Each structure stands twice: as structure tokens, then as C-alpha cells.
Amino acid sequence: MKRLSSAAIREQFLRFFEERGHVRVPSSSLIPGNDPTLLFTNSGMVQFKDTFLGLEQRPYTRATTAQKCLRVSGKHNDLEEVGPSPRHHTFFEMLGNFSFGDYFKAEAIPMAWELLTKVFDLPVERLWFTVFEGDDEVPPDDEAAQLWVAAGADPERVLRFGRKDNFWVMADAGPCGPCSEITIFIGDDLKEMSAKGVNSDDPNYVEIWNNVFMQFERSTMQPLHRPSVDTGMGLERMAMVMQGVHSTYDTDLFIPLIERQLALLGADEPTYRAHVAPFRAVADHSRAVAFLIADGVLPGNTGRSYVLRRILRRAVYQGRTVGFEKPFLADVAAVVIEQMGAVYPELRERADFILETVDLEERQFLRTLSGGVSILKSVIERVRAVGGTVIPGDDAFTLKDTYGFPLDLTQKIAAEHGLTVDEAGYERRMEEQRARGRRAAQFKRAADAEAWADIDLPPTRFTGYLGVSGSGTVQALIVAGDQVAEAVAGQQVQIALDSTPFYAESGGQIGDTGVLIGPRGRARIDDVQRPVPGVIVHYGVVEEGAIAVYETVEAQVDSVRRAAIMRSHTATHLLHRALRDVLGEHAAQAGSLVAPDRLRFDFTHTRPVTPEQLREIERRVNAWIRADTPVAWQELPYQAALEAGAIALFGEKYGDVVRMVTIGCVNGNDALSPAAIAERQRAGFRMCSRELCGGTHVGRSGEIGLFRIVSESSVAAGVRRIEALTGAEAEQWVDAQIATLHNIAARVGAPPSQLGERIEALLAELKQRQRALDELHARQARSNLEGLLANVQAVGDIRFLAAQVEAPDTARLREMGDWLRDKLGSGVVVLAAVIDGKAQILAMATPDLAGRRIHAGNLVKALAPIVGGSGGGRPDMAQAGGREVAHIPDALEHVAAALAAQAGG
């Protein structure tokens, strides 16, 4: 058997099928394209699902891929098994070959045999093959069995199993069929090999390849007109076999990641062998984290984002168990990028963003971990003190709600102490919180969805791309939650038409406003929504007469407002492109608001955008506006739009046919004026934006007029926000800024051109005066403190000073204490002050006494209750605080007794 690297296995697999007429198709994203049924891509066939279902036609009938996959739950994987198990993974690569109605078993099985026995040179005597044994509904797969034997397999090595192991189903409807799996025995002694080990839990039998033969329609079990083939070979397992090891973690895919961890710790191989589980978990999770972030997922609290956060945090916690105290995961993820970036270029393209995101999330979690662990330990001690074995759900909830401590980590730490967590109680508290949130939140028109769902209406035809007015027939009316035949003057009403030019709020663009004019009345429209899919509903008030069902009304959108919205929306696309060009392709849209008076754009980026970057982004957008490039749209198949380079928004669901908005992307100069041509050449970048978008846009970029960024801020970890203005609003903002500039210039007595110099001079003067004032205050304070030294007392041979002073904050109080302690030479200083309305007590002991005869921390613990508070600290310095400032003199009176108690002890 050949010994091959993982890279060689991947390449030889793909090349083998390429040479046999297959198209090498790049891996799709870990985020399934336009498939809401899947959280992550978990097999090679996911990107071809619509092709297998007959919903999509590809320009080829044979394909081969190395597909990125992620499995974190369900039958395929349990996250807690990753690390302890020698072969479980979250992220993995699936090698596959596919036939879309082209070849079938008669060609697939001989090719599989040739690849395994000739190219990979696997020993035939170690291979086993399984086929479907048949049942009452489907006959046995004798054809596959015979083909394996014809290819060269020993008939005794071809085994038959039932549906559980050898029949594949996509869903209740669609293609299905028998599958044939190839298993290899990797044990040392061939005499111990037997058929009983196949499809068992024996680790010496490794399933390396599954060939699925789609030949039936699931709902009828009738033969398909064009049967297909879908195969999957796990690269990690194949590497394990080809490299002669018994764990995937001992292959060249994981060894560099484990070695990096050991290097960071300054540890050696025996350290790894003594703690394999956490090292392996970190190695696996670093791959999953790097690839998820590269594909656009950011850590968060819901959906895919929560899965990423959970994997990342589990890696960090596992790392802590082997000695990592500072952030380390980005260093390991860097090896993933270095190791796999050539095969998956998105890793290299987004390397900086990946590593910054990992580091930011890890540091945030370490802060959470530090606070949460100490709280959890106190809970564990409390439970154990009463002989309990279960951490109450209320405590687990408090850890999550107050400290951000995840339940799974609470469970893990509890298990390490022999305890469990009341998960039912935790879920009950979580549901109570969710219920409160639902009651408190005023979700727009939330109750309306139920009312409209009860009315059977066809989809509304939207005509607003072509104009801002048109006629439509009233299909239904709702007043006060009830369906009515007529709405009269003064009533708030919801109106559905069969067709409308009014745009319903969607994709960040707010809904239109305007009027509906009927034969007997008029309604003012204040908002437009889609409470149920496909149905556009106009929300407003009947101002005159009445509006009735089946009447034809004239729909008139507020054209001035719509034009302003279109300017904002087109500018949003230009901003998105500029962000990607300036910051990197990782700067993907994470949310937006498109309104007539402003736009807001959230995007993925880990650090503040610098002023220089903001200026360059703004420059590019305005250059694009001046170039007056055309804005066009077309409807086309989803896959065709992606192949044309259109940006599809992360997490958005698209139909089979999508609307692609193109801005610029002009190859020649035919569509541009001479001035625009010059502007485009002067700008120094290609003006081309393509996005999937259902919103409304201007006809040319020049209609935007002007673009100005007014703010840049953070909205969440790894997500930034830009707010901007366009058109007249941008001009007004610029005018206001100029007016402010002139006003400030007049106040400081300098022309606007010299304002910076004048402000610097004023600040320098202010700083000099502040320094002189501080020196004066310091002299006065020292004079006051010197006076206190006359009040030094003694308890036995211990000198002490106890006094109330005035201090603006605790920092100044400590400065006073330091000065007095140094002047005292040997002794104890106790100072008290009222700061922010509360009593603050500071105790300091000189080095000759601290920790030997006097403990400052114990001293303030004795004084704090007198002022209604608590405190503590080190032997040499401690602080306490309390609410009862009136009792400060009493606390100072008690210093002598407290010192006597310590000295006497």
C-alpha cells in the first residue's frame, strides 16, 4: 500500500475522475446556498441537491469535488465526542464523484475498484463491500454485488445489510436508492479479520467510501427515468488508512496543529500523549472556526453564529485544561490557513479577518470565563455543603443571563466535580425570559400576520419597478383585526390589492407611503408590509368617504420620498462595494436600513475603520456618483447570478429566479458621457457592483448627487456600522458642518484655514495652566497632610495615623496614603473620605509590619461594618466602602482597638 499525504490523496482522487470525464467543481460554502433546511453543508451532494431533484440543469453530467463539511449535532456527530474519540470531527473534507443521469452502477463500481486497488494500491485482502439485502418494498441489489465480484472482489467479501446501513433517502419525496459501502480492515493480524466486524463498533474496521445509487422516486418507489450516483469518501479517514495510523489526529492534517500547541506551551510529545483529548479538540475546532469565519459566519447567540461561538469557546476551555492561560487559538488557526490556504483560497484572502475575529472572541470569552468560573465554584461549594448533586437551574440561568456563561460549559465544569445541572429548570427560566421579551417587544404588525394568514389570497403583483402609480383591485380589508367589506372615513385600515406600485418593507428598504384613491373615497398610506409571504398590505387611514372590497383604486406612491429612498439604496450598494475594496472581501453586509433621509449599513469587520479608510471609502462612492454609471437589473436563475459574480447576502433566502442589480460594470464607454469617462479614469478603480436585490434603485449613479459618511461605530463583536446621507440631506449636513466650523473659528479668533493651529495653541495654554493649578493643589495637600503627622498615635510599639480627609476619588486617596506611609517610616495609616456620596476607607501598613504583625485587609474588614459596608485587600494595602458616611468618625475611633486585636494576636 502506498503512503500518501492528504494533499496527494485529494489531488489523485480529483484527477482520477477528471480523466474520466468529470468536471472538477470547487467546494461550495459551509453555508448551504439558498437551502433553509440545512444549518451547514454536511456532505458533498449538498451543492448538487437541486440538480438531483431535477430543479436545476448543470452544463455537465459528471462532477468531482473536495467539499468542505461541518457536522456538530444529530446522528452524525456529538460535539462532546470530538477530542476523546480518535476519529470524530466537526470540520472535515468529503471527496466525491457524481453522475447526474449519466453513468450508473455498471461504470461507478469498476471506477471505484480501480481507484482503490490500482491508484491507492489498497490491499484487496483487507477490503469489504456491502450492498442492500432487499426488503418487501425494494429488491436486493444483486447488480451491485455482481459488479463488485466482476471487478475482482472475493464473493465472500461482499456482504448484504438492511435499510439502516445500505439504503439512502433524501426526504419523504425525491430520489432514493441502495448504497454500497467500502470498509477496510486496519488491524495488525489478518487472522482476526471476519465479516462480523463490518458495520460494527470495532475500530479495526474503517468505512472509507460510500456509493449511493439513486434509482427510485421515494413517494412511489418507481424507478427513476435517469438514475444518478452520489459518492462520499472522508479525506481524514482515508489519510489515516494511507498513512498507517489508527487515529485521524495522527495524520498530516492534524499533526501540525498539535505541534503548534505544544510549541506555544513549550511542551513535548509525552505531554500530548498524556492529554490527547484537549489537544485534539483544539486542533479540530481551529479548523472549523477558521473555515466558518472564512465563509462569513461570525460568533453570536443564534443559529450558525451560536454554533461557531460554541465551538470556539469549547476550544478555548479545552486549551485552558492543558495550560493555556493567554489567548492562543488564533496562533493555531494561523496554521490552518497556512496548511490549507492553497486548496481553499478564501482562507488566505480573509486571513487577517479570521485571526482578528478569533482573537477578539477568545479575549472576550476569557473575561467571561474568569468571572463565571469563580461564581460557579461558589455554587458548587454551596451544593456540596448540603450534600447535593445537582446545580439548580436558577443558578445555571443566572450564570448565563448575568455573566454570559454558556450552559454547556456549566455542565462540563459541574461534571468535573461529579455534579449535574437541572437542565429542565434552566430551560424553564429561559422560556420565562423569552415570554417576557415577547410580551414587552412591540413587533410591528405582529398580530396582523395571523389575521392575513386566515385569508386565502394570491400573491400581489408588484409594479413599482416600472413606476410610482398604477391601478389595483381591492382584494381584502382589515379593520381592528377583523376582515370587513368596507372601511369608512376615520378608520385605520389594512388594504390588500391584486397589484400595486407600493414597495413593501424588505431587505432593509422601508415601505413606501402615498395614497389610494377609489371611486368613493381616499386612504392615506403610511406603511407597506408583507405580513404573510407574497401578499403586500397597505397600512393607513381612510381620510375621505369609503374604500370597499372589489373596488378599483388608483395607487399613487409619494414620488419625492421614493426617489430619496432609491438614492439611499443605490448608495448602499456602492458603499458595500467600496467597503470590500478598501477593507477586504470579508466586509460583508450584516444588516441595513434604507430610508429617505439616511442609510445605515452594518458589516463584518473586527476593528474600527480608520479615518483614512473612511475618507477613501467616501471618495470612491462619490467618484462613482460623478461617473454617472448606469444602474440595471435583470431576473435570472439563482445559480446563474452567482456565476455572474453577484453578491448574495449571508442568511438570506432566495427563490429559484432572482433579481440582480448591476451598477457600472461597463466594459466600453458607450453608456457614459465624456465627463463620466474622465471621472472613471481619474478614480483609479473598477466601478462594478452586482448584488441580488429586490429593492428599488435610481437609473444612473449620478442621480444620488452626493454621499457623506456621518458616523462609524461598533454594534456587536466583529460587526461595525456606518451611517450616511445622500442627495439634499448630505448637502444640508455639509452646510451645517461648514457653519459650525465658521462659528468655532469666530469664537477662537482665527480664520477657518488656521483653526487647527489656533486650537493647538489654546490646548497647550490650557495644559500649562492646569499643570500650574495641579502643582498648587499638591502643595496645599502636602501642607494639610504634614499637619496630620502631628496626630500620630500608638498602640504598644505600633504607631498609627487615623484621619478623615477630602479626596475627589480613590486614586487621590491612595496618593495621600502613600505619602503619609512613607513619612511615617514604620506604622499604619488609615484614611477615610466621602467620595461620590459613600464612605471610603483606606488602610496601609509599612513593609516591616505588613503580613507579620498587621494585615491591612483584615483591618478594613473590621472597620467596614461600622460604615455599613465591606472590604478587604492585601496585607500592605486594603480598601473598604460603605453607605453610612455619618459613621466615619466611629470607624476611625475603632482603629486603635482593631490594631490592638491584631498586634495582640
Swiss-Prot record:
Family in the record: Belongs to the class-II aminoacyl-tRNA synthetase family.
Protein name, per record: Alanine--tRNA ligase
Subcellular location, principal: cytoplasm
One of the Pfam families matching this protein, by short name: tRNA-synt_2c
CDD domains listed in its UniProt record: AlaRS_core
Residues annotated as binding Zn(2+): 569, 573, 693, 697
Keywords per UniProt: Aminoacyl-tRNA synthetase, ATP-binding, Cytoplasm, Ligase, Metal-binding, Nucleotide-binding, Protein biosynthesis, RNA-binding, tRNA-binding, Zinc
Highest taxon, organism lineage: Bacteria
Coiled-coil stretches noted in the UniProt entry, renumbered to this chain: none
Organism annotation: Roseiflexus castenholzii (strain DSM 13941 / HLO8)
InterPro entries: aa-tRNA-synth_II/BPL/LPL, Ala-tRNA-lgiase_IIc, Ala-tRNA-ligase_IIc_anticod-bd, Ala-tRNA-synth_IIc_core, Ala-tRNA-synth_IIc_N, Ala-tRNA_ligase, Ala_tRNA_ligase_euk/bac, DHHA1_dom
Keyword Amino-acid biosynthesis belongs to the record: no
Function: Catalyzes the attachment of alanine to tRNA(Ala) in a two-step reaction: alanine is first activated by ATP to form Ala-AMP and then transferred to the acceptor end of tRNA(Ala). Also edits incorrectly charged Ser-tRNA(Ala) and Gly-tRNA(Ala) via its editing domain.
Compartment(s): Cytoplasm
Cofactor(s) required for function per UniProt: Zn(2+)
Assigned GO CC terms: cytosol
